[in-house]
Amino acid sequence: MQNRRRSRPVVPTPMARVRHRHLLLLVAAVAAAASALLPCASAVRPFVLVLSRDDFLKDTAGAHPSLPSADADSDEWDDFDDESPATDPLLSPSSWVPLLDPASASPSGDEPDSPSDALFVAGVRAMLSAASAGDDAAFATAAAQIEAAATGGHPGAQSALAFLSGAGMTRPASRSRAFLLHKFAADAGDLQSKMALAYSFFRQEMYEEAVTLYAELAEAALTSSLISKEPPVIEPVRLHSGTEENKEALRKSRGEDDEDFQITEYQAQRGNTVAMHKLGLLYYYGLRGVRRDYGKAYHWFSKAVEKGDTRAMELLGEIYARGAGVERNYTEAYKWLTLAAKQQQYSAYNGLGYLYVKGYGVEKKNLTKAKEFFEIAAEHKEHGGYYNLGVLYLKGIGVKRDVMTACNFFLRAVNAGQPKAIYQVAKLFQKGVGLKRNLQMAAVMYKSVAERGPWSSLSRWALESYLKGDIGKALLLYSRMADLGYEVAQSNAAWILDRYGDESICMGESGFCTDMERHLRAHALWWQASEQGNEHAALLIGDAYYYGRGVGRDYERAAEAYMHAQSQSNAQAMFNLGYMHEHGHGLPLDLHLAKRYYDQAVEVDPAAKLPVMLALTSLWIRKNYDGSFLVHFIDSLPEVYPVVEEWVEDVLMDEGNATIFTLFACLVTVLYLRERQRRQAAAANPQQPDGAPI
């Protein structure tokens, strides 16, 4: 029986499958932080996608019915966005961003097209305002307006109402009603509801449905990544580090108000080339809370080029090719990319290769020269070169079609964090071209790209609200993004609920959240985040079950959550599992396993040396003096500690009592020192009678 319980963590249970799935997601999500730009000069955080031979098909050369046509003018090459969409995808009737930014146009234009449009706009604006003010009555009124708009068939209102229904805000929580409303909105073209539905299917392992939606959303994300006024958030900021506020990350996210930014700007104005280049990157990509501004980016890159900065030459070439902040001019793009390439800026070769594929800014198309330039870029580990060589071999453009070679190039680009390559590999997994059909992996990879869509800009507004002290609005926006499947938003919303539980910011079924509603909502969010690889979330879920916080005490479910965190190399979870084995709480009483977990904890985190040493001492005492008074005393400590802690907080830490205790301690110290002085003097004069003056 004991062995059976001990082996439980490795049994392929549904939770184990979820864990495996979301560990893959965590890996792929890191790639979403990479830039989608072709000749990208910014840093990319790589990750490793490891495939075995079994993942590849044996016959991967030649024609395939699912392969795209060999066309050099295909959309696969539109890295410089030849045609801009008629409308900014952010200004769809469903977007909240224009409602957050007073400078933006109304999502429905200057005048609402219908009464439902007017109700939706007024409702969402009132809801955001009520969340900021902590006004539950106004929030309920706003929700009623949104519901009225949803009844009128407005897809954005249906999507917002689905969010409120799923969270249990101003109405009983109902996942089935939320799903139905998201379905109505998605069928009407609402992309945010499609995100929510895709995530719902993904959690239920309904990969066929998830892949269909995520593929569409990933394509939309790639299309909009460079033409939207609000760039995708490629630096999701986690508000917390463990249980504490992540002050360093927050400090670096204050945009132009950040001290580091102001220092960089000052240095750039003083002629520092490195600072000019850095400032240009911040404006070009919209990093660290800085609003994207192509005009300022062009200004600083031009200044840097005047100082001889070769990296800025390459970026100027890209700016002219894209027409970002300037009139599109492929001749100028070719000039600057050529200058950069001569200065050994190898990613510029990738841009030149693109121009030769399309025949832009050059005499004519030249696929041979394009391939040579892509190869030079790839030889120097430029991910854009890998990607474009992959497209050449996948389609047989200027080379013999070879899917295996294409897959290898795409995988190298994926491991360098290239979003388009992630999209391509996802498509190969989806269609079973070159790689065995694997819808689970396709969903994972499509999801990581889809999360770069324009809807990700909500997290920018959530972060700005938090930094301004508008916790209510931050919670609402993070909760909205959590509904769309963003892990960072899920953990941020859960952390806010835990950290600011005493404040009136959580909207419940009727008025503000009760403590139980708040605990349950935070618990659900932590659980979703833990499914997506957040080890701290899994640890907190274990604590909730172990101590009965917001849920019924359940040692076995606590152990499952700790095992989930332990599988992600969390030292605290290892320590907790050791403690549970030592005391037989939810796990078999097994001192050998307890010691093993304690040892693992200190191996993973050397800072755990002291608590592990104390735990091992307790383990030795329990093993050698089982049933003794000392063991009973050790077992009673967890019950005594909260009482002592409460006494310290309520009595000792009270301002008045603390002053009295401090004065008393000072008095005792003075009396002690005085008595010691008297005794020392008496010892120095042994003939002096007792009581004589010193």
UniProtKB/Swiss-Prot annotation:
It is found in: Endoplasmic reticulum membrane. Keywords: Endoplasmic reticulum, Glycoprotein, Membrane, Repeat, Signal, Transmembrane, Transmembrane helix. Sel1-like repeats lie at residues 157-190, 275-309, 311-343, 348-380, 386-417, 419-453, 537-568, 571-602. Residues 61-116 are annotated as: Disordered. It comes from the Eukaryota. It is a single-pass membrane protein. SMART domains: SEL1 (SM00671). Glycans are attached at N329, N366. GO terms for biological process: ERAD pathway. The keyword Glycoprotein applies. The chain crosses the membrane at residues 651-671. Pfam families: Sel1 (PF08238). One of its GO terms (cellular component) is endoplasmic reticulum membrane. Gene3D superfamilies: Tetratricopeptide repeat domain. Residues 72-85 have a biased composition (Acidic residues). Residues 1-43 form the signal peptide. Residues 89-109 have a biased composition (Low complexity). PANTHER family: ERAD-ASSOCIATED E3 UBIQUITIN-PROTEIN LIGASE COMPONENT HRD3A-RELATED. Component of the endoplasmic reticulum (ER) quality control system called ER-associated degradation (ERAD) and involved in ubiquitin-dependent degradation of misfolded endoplasmic reticulum proteins. Functions as an ERAD substrate-recruiting factor that recognizes misfolded proteins for the HRD1 E3 ubiquitin ligase complex. Belongs to the sel-1 family. This is ERAD-associated E3 ubiquitin-protein ligase component HRD3. The gene is HRD3.
